[in-house]
């Protein structure tokens, strides 16, 4: 088993079987039922299949398919050195289909000092968020662009303090998320020690809200957050605010709405640019959630309380 495969923690799989698994994701079936209804994720699956087909075709014509990747580098141990883009040439015929596969191959074979975050490799943890060819996304879900005539440029999430290379400081992002109090708040426990029950209809209202993986792609693509990171919570935090405002089990929904609308630096700092929705790797729509909270506040729409099931 090669050093790359050891780093990836997996064995060589059957290419034909892998293609069948990816094909099943286009309809949300097979091994990927969670992709059903997520257009952005299904588009990524289509791009991956296309990338694999093109790479396989080129592999049959040439022994190697070299592509250039320009990666942002900066070492805090050398504070007098300016950041720069370092070029790496990777053979796509011996690499996985995603950008994260490229980074792991580079770290294993070319430069062990390359720093980046990664964990699940399944688009669940949000660790490997970065900017790839000008778009914030997670590297494990971003297919490699098979066009070898131009390089792929990989940089850290924009307008964030860089710790090293592709690793950024997310402290403020998590603090803004925490300020939304993302947990169930009730005035009294349910009778007889039961769990807080919820009807299927009320549970359906949370779809498209709870799936956030806190990758910070949306927040770091928002100009309002760029210029006011200490005051404006950002799209990810506001999406979570709406998630709990929409939860029928929560008994502080009015207070939550008041907390984010009493100051112009909160929900009203959003200018509806919608970069957040365009860049979300999970296909969520923070801009819509923010608009709905504005509407609830401006129209004085009372939040309907529901009875326990």
UniProtKB/Swiss-Prot annotation:
InterPro entries: 2Fe-2S_ferredoxin-like_sf, 2Fe2S_fd_BS, 4Fe4S_Fe-S-bd, 4Fe4S_Fe_S_CS, Beta-grasp_dom_sf, Helical_ferredxn, SDH/FRD_Iron-Sulfur, Succ_DH/fum_Rdtase_Fe-S
Name of a matching Pfam family: Fer2_3
Keyword Plastid: no
Domain 2Fe-2S ferredoxin-type: 69-160
Catalyzed chemical reaction(s): a quinone + succinate = fumarate + a quinol
Main localization (coarse): mitochondrion
Domain 4Fe-4S ferredoxin-type: 202-232
Binding site for [3Fe-4S] cluster: 222, 270, 276
Membrane topology: Peripheral membrane protein
EC number: 1.3.5.1
GO terms, molecular function: 2 iron, 2 sulfur cluster binding; 3 iron, 4 sulfur cluster binding; 4 iron, 4 sulfur cluster binding; electron transfer activity; metal ion binding; succinate dehydrogenase (quinone) activity; succinate dehydrogenase activity
Residues annotated to bind a ubiquinone: 227
Location of the protein in the cell: Mitochondrion inner membrane
Cellular component, GO annotation: mitochondrial inner membrane; mitochondrion; respiratory chain complex II (succinate dehydrogenase)
Disulfide bonds: none
List of residues binding [2Fe-2S] cluster: 120, 125, 140
Record keywords: 2Fe-2S, 3Fe-4S, 4Fe-4S, Electron transport, Iron, Iron-sulfur, Membrane, Metal-binding, Mitochondrion, Mitochondrion inner membrane, Oxidoreductase, Transit peptide, Transport, Tricarboxylic acid cycle
Cofactor stoichiometry and binding remark: Binds 1 [2Fe-2S] cluster.
Superkingdom as given in the UniProt entry: Eukaryota
Keyword DNA damage: no
Residues of the transit peptide: 1-22
Summary of subunit composition and partner proteins: Component of complex II composed of eight subunits in plants: four classical SDH subunits SDH1, SDH2, SDH3 and SDH4 (a flavoprotein (FP), an iron-sulfur protein (IP), and a cytochrome b composed of a large and a small subunit.), as well as four subunits unknown in mitochondria from bacteria and heterotrophic eukaryotes.
Role, per record: Iron-sulfur protein (IP) subunit of succinate dehydrogenase (SDH) that is involved in complex II of the mitochondrial electron transport chain and is responsible for transferring electrons from succinate to ubiquinone (coenzyme Q).
Family: Belongs to the succinate dehydrogenase/fumarate reductase iron-sulfur protein family.
Protein name in the entry: Succinate dehydrogenase [ubiquinone] iron-sulfur subunit 3, mitochondrial
Organism: Arabidopsis thaliana
